[in-house]
Amino acid sequence: MASAEAAFEPRFLETRDGVRLRAGLWNAAEGIPFRGVCLVLQGHSEFLEKYFEVFDELRGRGFAVAAFDWRGQGGSARALEDSRKAHIIDFAQYAEDLRAFMDQIVRHMDDRPPFALAHSMGGHILLRNLHDHPGIIRAAAFSAPMLRVFTNPFPENLAIRIARWMVRFGRGNDYVFGAGKRDPIALPFAQNIVTSDPVRYARTIAHLEADPSLCLAGPTWHWLSAAFASMAITAEPGYAEAITAPVMIATAGHDRVVRTEATIAFAQRMPHCFHGMVEGAEHEILMEQDRFRALFWQAFDDFIARALPGT
Protein backbone atom coordinates (compact mmCIF):
# COMPACT_ATOMS: atom_id res chain seq x y z
CA MET A 1 0.00 0.00 0.00
CA ALA A 2 1.08 3.58 -0.54
CA SER A 3 2.20 5.22 2.68
CA ALA A 4 -0.11 7.65 4.46
CA GLU A 5 2.27 10.45 3.54
CA ALA A 6 2.30 9.54 -0.15
CA ALA A 7 -1.48 9.04 -0.24
CA PHE A 8 -2.37 12.22 1.67
CA GLU A 9 -4.88 14.37 -0.19
CA PRO A 10 -6.29 17.08 2.09
CA ARG A 11 -10.05 17.38 2.32
CA PHE A 12 -11.95 20.26 3.83
CA LEU A 13 -15.25 20.57 5.63
CA GLU A 14 -17.10 23.39 7.36
CA THR A 15 -18.66 23.35 10.81
CA ARG A 16 -22.07 24.79 11.62
CA ASP A 17 -20.40 27.94 12.94
CA GLY A 18 -18.49 28.42 9.69
CA VAL A 19 -15.02 27.12 10.60
CA ARG A 20 -13.03 25.37 7.85
CA LEU A 21 -11.34 22.16 8.98
CA ARG A 22 -8.65 20.18 7.18
CA ALA A 23 -9.05 16.40 7.13
CA GLY A 24 -7.52 13.26 5.68
CA LEU A 25 -8.81 9.77 4.88
CA TRP A 26 -6.81 6.61 4.24
CA ASN A 27 -7.90 3.13 3.18
CA ALA A 28 -7.00 0.05 5.20
CA ALA A 29 -4.17 -2.12 3.93
CA GLU A 30 -5.18 -4.69 1.33
CA GLY A 31 -5.14 -8.40 2.13
CA ILE A 32 -6.04 -7.86 5.79
CA PRO A 33 -9.53 -8.38 7.28
CA PHE A 34 -11.27 -5.02 7.46
CA ARG A 35 -11.97 -3.96 11.04
CA GLY A 36 -13.74 -0.70 10.30
CA VAL A 37 -12.86 2.96 10.61
CA CYS A 38 -10.48 4.33 13.22
CA LEU A 39 -10.92 8.00 14.04
CA VAL A 40 -7.63 9.59 15.17
CA LEU A 41 -7.89 12.67 17.37
CA GLN A 42 -4.68 14.65 17.80
CA GLY A 43 -3.54 16.66 20.78
CA HIS A 44 -3.11 20.39 21.34
CA SER A 45 -0.98 22.14 18.68
CA GLU A 46 -0.59 18.98 16.56
CA PHE A 47 -1.30 18.37 12.88
CA LEU A 48 -2.08 15.52 10.48
CA GLU A 49 1.44 15.17 9.10
CA LYS A 50 2.80 14.33 12.54
CA TYR A 51 0.70 11.14 12.59
CA PHE A 52 1.57 9.59 9.23
CA GLU A 53 3.46 6.75 10.94
CA VAL A 54 0.55 6.07 13.31
CA PHE A 55 -1.93 6.11 10.43
CA ASP A 56 0.08 3.44 8.61
CA GLU A 57 0.29 1.29 11.74
CA LEU A 58 -3.49 1.41 12.06
CA ARG A 59 -3.98 0.68 8.36
CA GLY A 60 -1.74 -2.35 8.74
CA ARG A 61 -4.08 -3.56 11.47
CA GLY A 62 -7.09 -3.49 9.16
CA PHE A 63 -8.45 -0.03 9.89
CA ALA A 64 -9.37 2.70 7.47
CA VAL A 65 -8.23 5.95 9.06
CA ALA A 66 -10.08 9.25 9.37
CA ALA A 67 -8.43 12.27 10.99
CA PHE A 68 -8.64 16.05 11.02
CA ASP A 69 -6.97 19.12 12.47
CA TRP A 70 -8.88 20.85 15.27
CA ARG A 71 -9.89 24.46 14.64
CA GLY A 72 -7.00 26.78 15.38
CA GLN A 73 -4.22 24.32 14.58
CA GLY A 74 -2.66 22.34 11.74
CA GLY A 75 -4.22 23.20 8.40
CA SER A 76 -7.56 24.28 9.86
CA ALA A 77 -8.81 27.85 10.15
CA ARG A 78 -7.48 30.18 12.83
CA ALA A 79 -9.67 32.43 14.96
CA LEU A 80 -7.21 35.31 15.39
CA GLU A 81 -4.99 37.36 13.12
CA ASP A 82 -1.90 35.90 14.82
CA SER A 83 -2.06 32.37 13.40
CA ARG A 84 0.43 31.11 16.00
CA LYS A 85 -2.05 31.56 18.84
CA ALA A 86 -4.01 28.54 20.04
CA HIS A 87 -7.38 30.12 20.74
CA ILE A 88 -10.79 28.88 21.78
CA ILE A 89 -13.63 30.37 23.82
CA ASP A 90 -15.25 27.12 24.93
CA PHE A 91 -14.28 23.49 24.44
CA ALA A 92 -17.80 22.96 23.10
CA GLN A 93 -16.36 24.41 19.89
CA TYR A 94 -14.03 21.41 19.64
CA ALA A 95 -17.05 19.17 20.20
CA GLU A 96 -18.64 20.88 17.18
CA ASP A 97 -15.53 20.06 15.12
CA LEU A 98 -15.88 16.40 16.03
CA ARG A 99 -19.63 16.40 15.36
CA ALA A 100 -19.12 17.96 11.92
CA PHE A 101 -16.41 15.46 11.00
CA MET A 102 -18.47 12.50 12.16
CA ASP A 103 -21.63 13.67 10.37
CA GLN A 104 -20.09 14.85 7.12
CA ILE A 105 -17.36 12.26 6.59
CA VAL A 106 -16.98 9.37 9.03
CA ARG A 107 -20.55 8.08 8.97
CA HIS A 108 -20.30 7.63 5.19
CA MET A 109 -17.22 5.39 5.46
CA ASP A 110 -18.75 2.38 7.23
CA ASP A 111 -22.16 1.31 8.51
CA ARG A 112 -20.75 0.54 11.95
CA PRO A 113 -19.73 3.12 14.57
CA PRO A 114 -16.02 3.87 14.35
CA PHE A 115 -13.22 2.98 16.71
CA ALA A 116 -11.18 5.91 18.04
CA LEU A 117 -7.57 6.58 19.03
CA ALA A 118 -7.01 9.88 20.82
CA HIS A 119 -4.06 11.71 22.36
CA SER A 120 -3.96 14.31 25.15
CA MET A 121 -6.40 17.15 24.33
CA GLY A 122 -8.00 14.95 21.69
CA GLY A 123 -8.49 12.34 24.40
CA HIS A 124 -10.17 14.88 26.65
CA ILE A 125 -12.61 15.87 23.92
CA LEU A 126 -13.30 12.22 23.11
CA LEU A 127 -14.02 11.40 26.76
CA ARG A 128 -16.60 14.18 26.81
CA ASN A 129 -18.09 12.79 23.59
CA LEU A 130 -18.30 9.27 25.05
CA HIS A 131 -20.06 10.70 28.09
CA ASP A 132 -22.51 12.90 26.19
CA HIS A 133 -23.20 10.64 23.19
CA PRO A 134 -22.96 6.96 24.17
CA GLY A 135 -22.94 4.50 21.29
CA ILE A 136 -21.46 6.80 18.65
CA ILE A 137 -17.99 5.28 19.18
CA ARG A 138 -17.61 1.48 19.42
CA ALA A 139 -14.48 1.50 21.55
CA ALA A 140 -11.61 3.89 22.18
CA ALA A 141 -7.90 3.88 22.99
CA PHE A 142 -6.24 6.84 24.67
CA SER A 143 -2.68 8.08 24.90
CA ALA A 144 -2.12 10.30 27.95
CA PRO A 145 -5.55 12.00 27.93
CA MET A 146 -5.75 15.53 29.30
CA LEU A 147 -7.68 15.47 32.58
CA ARG A 148 -5.40 17.63 34.71
CA VAL A 149 -2.28 19.48 33.61
CA PHE A 150 0.90 20.73 35.21
CA THR A 151 0.66 24.47 35.85
CA ASN A 152 4.26 25.30 36.78
CA PRO A 153 5.37 27.69 38.18
CA PHE A 154 1.95 28.39 39.71
CA PRO A 155 -0.18 26.16 41.95
CA GLU A 156 -3.14 24.81 40.01
CA ASN A 157 -5.80 26.83 41.85
CA LEU A 158 -3.86 30.05 41.31
CA ALA A 159 -3.33 29.26 37.61
CA ILE A 160 -7.07 28.75 37.20
CA ARG A 161 -7.80 32.08 38.87
CA ILE A 162 -5.18 33.93 36.83
CA ALA A 163 -6.68 32.61 33.57
CA ARG A 164 -10.16 33.73 34.65
CA TRP A 165 -8.90 37.16 35.68
CA MET A 166 -7.08 37.72 32.39
CA VAL A 167 -10.24 36.88 30.44
CA ARG A 168 -12.39 39.04 32.72
CA PHE A 169 -10.09 42.03 32.29
CA GLY A 170 -10.12 41.85 28.51
CA ARG A 171 -6.82 40.00 27.99
CA GLY A 172 -8.36 36.74 26.80
CA ASN A 173 -6.90 37.00 23.30
CA ASP A 174 -3.36 37.56 24.61
CA TYR A 175 -0.79 34.81 24.86
CA VAL A 176 -0.39 33.20 28.27
CA PHE A 177 2.78 34.30 30.03
CA GLY A 178 5.85 33.67 27.87
CA ALA A 179 4.07 31.86 25.05
CA GLY A 180 4.44 34.62 22.47
CA LYS A 181 8.21 34.23 22.46
CA ARG A 182 8.15 30.50 21.74
CA ASP A 183 9.40 29.13 18.44
CA PRO A 184 8.73 25.38 18.22
CA ILE A 185 11.05 25.02 15.23
CA ALA A 186 13.98 26.45 17.19
CA LEU A 187 13.42 24.40 20.36
CA PRO A 188 16.40 22.03 20.80
CA PHE A 189 15.61 18.37 21.32
CA ALA A 190 17.26 18.46 24.75
CA GLN A 191 14.74 21.06 25.94
CA ASN A 192 11.58 19.29 24.78
CA ILE A 193 9.41 17.50 27.35
CA VAL A 194 7.17 15.37 25.12
CA THR A 195 9.44 12.66 23.65
CA SER A 196 12.82 11.05 24.29
CA ASP A 197 13.13 9.94 20.66
CA PRO A 198 15.42 12.29 18.70
CA VAL A 199 14.48 10.85 15.30
CA ARG A 200 10.73 11.31 15.70
CA TYR A 201 11.27 14.72 17.25
CA ALA A 202 13.39 15.77 14.27
CA ARG A 203 10.72 14.48 11.90
CA THR A 204 8.09 16.67 13.57
CA ILE A 205 10.37 19.70 13.31
CA ALA A 206 11.00 18.89 9.63
CA HIS A 207 7.25 19.04 8.96
CA LEU A 208 7.10 22.47 10.63
CA GLU A 209 10.09 23.71 8.67
CA ALA A 210 8.48 22.53 5.43
CA ASP A 211 5.23 24.33 6.29
CA PRO A 212 5.65 26.99 9.01
CA SER A 213 1.91 27.72 8.86
CA LEU A 214 1.46 24.57 10.95
CA CYS A 215 3.31 26.16 13.89
CA LEU A 216 1.69 27.31 17.09
CA ALA A 217 3.61 29.36 19.64
CA GLY A 218 1.19 28.81 22.52
CA PRO A 219 -2.30 29.26 23.90
CA THR A 220 -4.24 32.39 24.75
CA TRP A 221 -5.80 33.06 28.14
CA HIS A 222 -9.20 32.27 26.62
CA TRP A 223 -7.90 28.85 25.54
CA LEU A 224 -6.40 28.13 28.95
CA SER A 225 -9.49 29.26 30.83
CA ALA A 226 -11.68 27.12 28.56
CA ALA A 227 -9.39 24.12 29.14
CA PHE A 228 -9.62 24.50 32.91
CA ALA A 229 -13.41 24.81 32.67
CA SER A 230 -13.67 21.66 30.57
CA MET A 231 -11.38 19.71 32.89
CA ALA A 232 -13.60 20.76 35.79
CA ILE A 233 -16.53 19.14 33.99
CA THR A 234 -14.76 15.79 33.58
CA ALA A 235 -13.74 15.93 37.27
CA GLU A 236 -17.36 16.08 38.43
CA PRO A 237 -18.59 13.18 40.61
CA GLY A 238 -20.10 10.38 38.55
CA TYR A 239 -18.65 11.60 35.25
CA ALA A 240 -16.18 8.76 34.68
CA GLU A 241 -18.68 6.19 35.91
CA ALA A 242 -21.16 7.28 33.21
CA ILE A 243 -18.79 6.39 30.35
CA THR A 244 -19.78 2.85 29.42
CA ALA A 245 -17.87 2.27 26.16
CA PRO A 246 -14.91 -0.14 26.20
CA VAL A 247 -11.83 1.99 26.79
CA MET A 248 -8.06 1.54 26.95
CA ILE A 249 -5.97 4.28 28.55
CA ALA A 250 -2.19 4.37 28.31
CA THR A 251 -0.39 6.78 30.61
CA ALA A 252 3.23 7.90 30.33
CA GLY A 253 5.45 7.14 33.30
CA HIS A 254 7.48 10.32 32.85
CA ASP A 255 4.70 12.65 31.73
CA ARG A 256 5.47 16.33 32.37
CA VAL A 257 2.41 17.73 30.59
CA VAL A 258 -0.63 15.99 32.08
CA ARG A 259 -0.97 14.67 35.60
CA THR A 260 -0.84 10.90 35.38
CA GLU A 261 -2.27 10.36 38.86
CA ALA A 262 -5.48 12.13 37.82
CA THR A 263 -5.76 9.97 34.72
CA ILE A 264 -5.27 6.76 36.71
CA ALA A 265 -7.92 7.80 39.23
CA PHE A 266 -10.33 8.56 36.38
CA ALA A 267 -9.60 5.23 34.68
CA GLN A 268 -10.26 3.31 37.90
CA ARG A 269 -13.73 4.82 38.10
CA MET A 270 -14.74 3.85 34.55
CA PRO A 271 -16.75 0.61 34.36
CA HIS A 272 -15.07 -0.83 31.25
CA CYS A 273 -11.56 0.59 31.22
CA PHE A 274 -8.18 -1.12 30.88
CA HIS A 275 -5.30 1.05 32.07
CA GLY A 276 -1.62 0.51 31.37
CA MET A 277 1.42 2.55 32.32
CA VAL A 278 4.27 2.95 29.82
CA GLU A 279 7.08 3.33 32.32
CA GLY A 280 9.74 5.85 31.34
CA ALA A 281 7.82 7.34 28.43
CA GLU A 282 7.30 11.06 27.99
CA HIS A 283 3.88 12.57 27.23
CA GLU A 284 3.69 11.74 23.51
CA ILE A 285 3.79 7.95 23.76
CA LEU A 286 3.08 7.48 20.05
CA MET A 287 6.04 9.73 19.17
CA GLU A 288 8.36 7.96 21.60
CA GLN A 289 11.20 5.47 21.22
CA ASP A 290 10.35 2.11 19.66
CA ARG A 291 10.62 0.29 23.01
CA PHE A 292 7.89 2.48 24.50
CA ARG A 293 5.72 2.41 21.41
CA ALA A 294 5.92 -1.38 21.29
CA LEU A 295 4.35 -1.55 24.76
CA PHE A 296 1.52 0.72 23.63
CA TRP A 297 0.81 -1.26 20.47
CA GLN A 298 0.86 -4.59 22.33
CA ALA A 299 -1.73 -3.25 24.77
CA PHE A 300 -3.69 -1.80 21.86
CA ASP A 301 -3.76 -5.13 20.00
CA ASP A 302 -4.86 -7.00 23.12
CA PHE A 303 -7.58 -4.42 23.73
CA ILE A 304 -8.84 -4.59 20.15
CA ALA A 305 -9.05 -8.38 20.33
CA ARG A 306 -11.29 -8.07 23.40
CA ALA A 307 -13.29 -4.98 22.44
CA LEU A 308 -13.90 -5.81 18.78
CA PRO A 309 -14.12 -9.61 18.66
CA GLY A 310 -14.63 -11.12 15.25
CA THR A 311 -13.33 -8.10 13.34
Regions found by a protein language model. Give the residues of each.
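N-terminal cap/lid segment of alpha/beta-hydrolase-fold proteins
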Residues: 1-30
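Catalytic active-site module of serine/aspartate enzymes centered on a nucleophile-bearing elbow/loop
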Residues: 274, 279-311
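Conserved alpha/beta-hydrolase
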Residues: 48, 55-81
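Short alpha-helix in the alpha/beta-hydrolase fold that links the catalytic acid
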Residues: 245, 259-268
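Alpha/beta-hydrolase active-site loop
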Residues: 86-106
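Short beta-strand/loop motif that positions the catalytic acidic residue
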Residues: 243, 249-251, 255
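Active-site glycine-rich loops that stabilize anionic/oxyanionic intermediates
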Residues: 35, 41-46
